[in-house]
Swiss-Prot record:
Catalytic activity, EC: 3.1.-.-
Signal sequence, start to end: none
Keywords, sorted A to Z: Antiviral defense, DNA-binding, Endonuclease, Hydrolase, Magnesium, Manganese, Metal-binding, Nuclease
Gene Ontology molecular functions: DNA binding; DNA endonuclease activity; metal ion binding
Function statement: CRISPR (clustered regularly interspaced short palindromic repeat), is an adaptive immune system that provides protection against mobile genetic elements (viruses, transposable elements and conjugative plasmids). CRISPR clusters contain spacers, sequences complementary to antecedent mobile elements, and target invading nucleic acids. CRISPR clusters are transcribed and processed into CRISPR RNA (crRNA). Acts as a dsDNA endonuclease. Involved in the integration of spacer DNA into the CRISPR cassette.
Binding site for Mn(2+): E150, H213, E228
Source lineage: Bacteria, Bacillati, Bacillota, Clostridia, Moorellales
Cofactor(s) in the UniProt record: Mg(2+); Mn(2+)
Summary of subunit composition and partner proteins: Homodimer, forms a heterotetramer with a Cas2 homodimer.
Name listed for the protein in its UniProt record: CRISPR-associated endonuclease Cas1 2
GO BP: any one term: defense response to virus
InterPro entries from the UniProt entry: CRISPR-assoc_Cas1, CRISPR-assoc_Cas1_C, CRISPR-assoc_Cas1_HMARI/TNEAP, CRISPR-assoc_Cas1_N
Organism whose genome encodes this protein: Moorella thermoacetica (strain ATCC 39073 / JCM 9320)
Hydrolase keyword on record: yes
Amino acid sequence: MRTYYIFSSGRLRRMDNTLALELETERRVVPVEDIDHIYCFSELDLNTRLLDFLAQKQICLHFFNYYGHYSGSFIPRESQLSGFLLVRQVEHYLDQAKRLELARTFVEGALHNIRRNLEKREYDDICSKLDEIREGIGKTASIEELMSLEAHARKAYYDTWEEITGWEFGSRSKRPPANALNALISFGNAMMYTVVLKEIYRTALNPTISYLHEPSERRYSLALDVAEIFKPVFVDRLIFRLINLNMLKETHFDTNVNFVYLTEGGRKVFVKEFEETLEKTILHRKLKRNIRYKSLVRLDLYKLIKHLLGEEKYSPMKVWW
């Protein structure tokens, strides 16, 4: 399945049994049969007829504003429903011991993958610090304590980024991102979130019931939980590569008063390489066959379902390459 990116302002509408993107000077026909995501990075006019058509075709539509900040997603009605699984999801949230167990596994997976990013870069002192923090995961008594532990680990991790990239970083700033590296992280994390959200939609999991992040209105918090595991592998490694290979430069960023954002050219570079990353293949050690990177997300969700159903303990994806 393909992902379609829209960077030009215009109107997206249904035309017979396909899509038409009407720009100021041309009309582009967009076949829908092999598309599962559409990303919009510009002003776009659409109507309910289009949304109904996208829902029929099970196509997700993701919106980013002028500055490349994630605004939200149109997600079709759930195609795979399981009342029993929903009950089990809720049970694991309401039972604090079960919730904490799952939340710990998300953090453990994330910190393992963070450490792997540093192992070959001779950051032995930081790796040792991460090991100490990971040893404390099983001792945490609350979600708040666990998230505080994760925050300390990420700070130690981010302290290496200026040396790895050669770019100014300082500290992590999200709303708004204070410099180019922070803008890249925020943009990449938003892209990862949408990938996980789409994969959740392909299962019977409810994306609003989560364990590490607190469920709340107006967000699919389970996608945030699972994305923690994959951000170090799909996003952080890509950022290092784009900068170290000089594919992204500081000219790919603009500053608006008190924050920095990717230009359209910068976003195009990132999404192109991000798509290629998702399509890469790796020999899966357990399945003994090559699978695409983005398939790792779906496999992780299936493992989570088995855990919720009491069939098998959940073990998050831990990068081995």
